[in-house]
Amino acid sequence: MMDWITKAVFYHIYPLGFCGAPRFNADGERVNRIEKLVDWIPHLKELGVNAVYLGPVFESSEHGYDTKDYYQIDKRLGDRHAFRTVCGRLHESGIRVVLDGVFNHVGREFWAFRDVQQNGRGSRYCGWFHNLSFGGGSPMGDPFWYDAWEGHFNLVKLNLKNPEVVDHLLGAVGSWIQDFGIDGLRLDAADCVDPDFFRRLRSFCKEKKPDFWLMGEIIHGDYNRWANPEMLDSVTNYECYKGIYSSHNDKNYFEIAYSLNRQFGDGGIYKNIYTYNFVDNHDVNRLASVLRNPEHLENVYTLLFTMPGAPSVYYGSEWGLPGIKENGSDWPLRPCLDLHSLPPVNEKLSRHIAKLSRLKEMCVPLQTGDYRQIVVKNEQLVYRREAGGQALYTALNLADGPASLGFGVTPGKVLVDVLNHHQVFSPVNGSVELPVEPYSARVLLERDAYEIHLPEAVDFAAPPIIPQEVEPGLYRHFKGHEYEVLGVARHTETMEPLVVYRDPQDHQKLWARPLSMFLETVNAGGRCQPRFQKL
């Protein structure tokens, strides 16, 4: 498995909508809108994103999935030079680029199909299209028949058994890799594509770029048919997409627990597939419009980021933006967004997702850990992931009241909540009784008990919770330096709590840093540990 994908946090953008392009590609001038993406890079970095999946960017008639030319950037977005600049800036910022590969079908304005329309039987491109024949007309008024994608005759199915077609498509992909340095492809309508084409595509891409990632859009069926050593690396996890939101709406965690265990548990059928996980996208109603209770938004994303696979956030949904299809149209799901004039947004949700992204980056169990269910109830769910000698628990409570969840932990270990201020939970007789507030979650790392500083007096008659407080005294930084904490102050304007500390050997060296930074967990040598630990 490629190392980068196990650490990936995706941000999905539909460029034509995001950039405010006209809905139809009329015969107008080329306009550079795609460079708008560059302005969003600081936001992506703040959110913890390290990979973007961009919807169609190549010349098309309307929505991008009706390609006119695989070798040209859509003139509503810009040109190859502008897109090369965007990809370069993303890569400089440590963000990988995955493009939409629409190879099952093209639009009716695709140049080779236009040749067939103009030259009929005399066109050398008749063999480029699936089941094209002159034995009857098409529903679009052509004097010939052709296969279309799911009956949409504005989307003409390509004949991927034709070597000329395959060479044309691979030539385009090769130019995207060479010119833009792309890191992967999302394959549209993958269930309709000839498997032999995927074999050729895999061989072609991996030869040019061994860590190139291929992910197929699969809605139904056995994911192993497409994601295997001969074809694709991954698929869209629509099974869990549905289970995640409906489990919260129906207050029934058994639904998503069944899917997670079926896919990734002991004997899981997709344990060898690093699935692409999401809670909304350009084709389905936005999460904020689907969830019946907005209080569940944070738990949904906590589940998304802590389950096996690569999490993806659809642009705008990090702020809880709504979006519902209208009259069968997907365009309301694909708005133009301006960072400087956003509608009312949920900043708390965005900060929560940023925190989850950091945990994904730092915690090996969230990258490659196995999956084991610990507690499954209608309104509570606990699962455990382990890798690299570390174990991590996710505990979710969707109820409107607090919950207490009891389960066993490894002897000699305590649990540290790396999502919530590093609270420490100590077991009693090998089990921990974990309190979880309404509509909330905990993400807990198992740590050796002797590594955790405990107060001298602990009242074990109460729930064994030892809050991680910043008290005056000596602390060791994870890099080995020692500092003397003087206390906690507040910023005079923002009122943000700041930890004030100094060098014990040189009192002239004084620092004031955000409390949240002081308490956070960092990845040091492949292991998660507190940034500062009291001596």
Question: What would you call each of these model-derived segments?
Answer:
Residues 1-99, 104-106, 111-115, 151-152, ...:
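N-terminal structural segment of carbohydrate-active enzymes
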Residues 13, 44, 54, 70, ...:
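Conserved, mostly hydrophobic/aromatic
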Residues 427-460:
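C-terminal beta-strand-rich structural cap/linker in extracellular carbohydrate-active enzymes
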Residues 374-408:
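Carbohydrate-binding surface patches
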Residues 16-34, 66-80, 151-166, 183-192, ...:
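The substrate-binding groove and active-site-proximal loops of carbohydrate-active enzymes
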Residues 30, 63-75, 103-144, 203, ...:
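Aromatic- and acidic-residue-enriched segments that line the glycan-binding/catalytic groove
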Residues 117, 174, 178, 188-270, ...:
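Active-site-proximal helices and loops of the catalytic beta/alpha 8
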Residues 459-535:
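Mixed-charge, low-complexity intrinsically disordered regions
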